[in-house]
Amino acid sequence: LAPSQAGAVELYDASEALQQAAHSAVLAYVDVNAAAIDHLVGLAGRQRMLSQRMAKFYFYRSWGLYDAPAEIELRFSRAHFTAVLIQIEKSPLVSTQVRAALAQLRREWEPYQQVLFASRDPVKMRMNAARVARLSERVLAATENLVTQLAAPSQRAPS
């Protein structure tokens, strides 16, 4: 199907419902698996979602849809992503491999957040849309690697 405003509205509603369901699943997982490292796995998993959420709200703003709420959500998601990244970086629980994954995520994150907030003009935002999509995928890959490293059996081995 070709992109349309009606399709974008439908996607918005569906993705918000999916995000709520995913958040509930993560909370249930953390409740069952009370190890401290599992909390970090959940946080890193949320980073994946937040990276995609920021791109989604960027695109909504560039299309003139949900402009004020999208701006608020975009800024909230960036603040949350940044705070969680710092929290994981400061954790004494992470291994050398996780620290390397965090460094890679930080390298991918900086240019992504810069382009997300480079302009509030929808025309300029649309001109940067392909770059946002590319950088979003790079951040997503880096967050996936972080989750993989945190969930690795070697991360769970006693020091």
Feature names for model-found ranges:
Residues 1-159:
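Mature extracytoplasmic or organellar-lumen-exposed domains after removal of signal/transit peptides
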